Amino acid sequence: MSPSPTALFCLGLCLGRVPAQSGPLPKPSLQALPSSLVPLEKPVTLRCQGPPGVDLYRLEKLSSSRYQDQAVLFIPAMKRSLAGRYRCSYQNGSLWSLPSDQLELVATGVFAKPSLSAQPGPAVSSGGDVTLQCQTRYGFDQFALYKEGDPAPYKNPERWYRASFPIITVTAAHSGTYRCYSFSSRDPYLWSAPSDPLELVVTGTSVTPSRLPTEPPSPVAEFSEATAELTVSFTNEVFTTETSRSITASPKESDSPAGPARQYYTKGNLVRICLGAVILIILAGFLAEDWHSRRKRLRHRGRAVQRPLPPLPPLPLTRKSNGGQDGGRQDVHSRGLCS
């Protein structure tokens, strides 16, 4: 027996409500709480976050066979063996998501702390330059500079025993507390203890009420603002090339454009007006051409209707008598009788 149309209709509705998955599942996020820089013997929590309704989470440590099928990994005491790269993923049905971005879990306090100093001094005027120097007694080739409030430190190779972090064109955003770390490239996740804090003070700056933020900034905005114009350069003993990285924070834009932005918007409006005028001219030309063609067709039709009339028959010839008009009429009448 063939299925009825009603049953087929209900089946189609049921299948239409089943969500179809196209492509891989979106990747989750992995974070370390309270921080990815963990002192030895201190607790840390790794949390994998995906969409609601996940069937299974998997959190794994790369370069090893360690993994667990849970979204949260609590480490009560940080060990050297637990430092490294982590990532996570989740499963819905038979589909696995893309892996999360890698998280670098660093164990600090493995080696003795370095020293951090500022040249020419920790107090610098706005617009000036200052260099933060990190120095250690051990032959480390990797150094990291960390500013309180930033999500991640700056890591760069330097010369043995010492690293320089120049800050060009200091602004008020550079003021704060800094620390540095030293480590070896052979064990990139085993760091020294942090240096003693260095307070960088920027003088000659003032914040007007109009520049105060009206809402709490996002973490991305805090990172960009706190690292404005920070240039980090390094030189290696083997390689003579010098590289630098500059991060510039743009000020908060107002609602109305100013300066070059206003000129850009004015030019854009002029371009739109010119384009509109050109389009109107083209439409007017099309309308004029159409009106002219219609008038021409009507003129041709009028010529076709006005045909020449047939010629009239010739009138009979009459003779005028001496007696005037009456005599002529009598002559015609007499000729007609005779004929």
UniProtKB/Swiss-Prot annotation:
Residue intervals of the Ig-like C2-type domain: 26-104, 114-196
Signal sequence range: 1-20
One Gene Ontology CC term in the entry: extracellular exosome
Glycosylation site residues: 92
Compositional bias annotation for Basic and acidic residues: 328-339
Extracellular side: 21-267
Keywords: Blood coagulation, Cell membrane, Disease variant, Disulfide bond, Glycoprotein, Hemostasis, Immunoglobulin domain, Membrane, Receptor, Repeat, Signal, Transmembrane, Transmembrane helix
Disulfide bonds: 48-88, 134-180
Cytoplasmic side, ranges: 289-339
One Gene Ontology MF term: transmembrane signaling receptor activity
Function: Collagen receptor involved in collagen-induced platelet adhesion and activation. Plays a key role in platelet procoagulant activity and subsequent thrombin and fibrin formation. This procoagulant function may contribute to arterial and venous thrombus formation. The signaling pathway involves the FcR gamma-chain, the Src kinases (likely FYN or LYN) and SYK, the adapter protein LAT and leads to the activation of PLCG2.
Disease: Bleeding disorder, platelet-type, 11: A mild to moderate bleeding disorder caused by defective platelet activation and aggregation in response to collagen.
Subunit structure: Associated with Fc receptor gamma chain. The GPVI:FcRgamma complex is associated with the Src kinase family FYN and LYN. Interacts with TRAF4. Interacts with COL1A1, but not with COL4A4.
Protein's recorded name: Platelet glycoprotein VI
Protein source organism: Homo sapiens (Human)
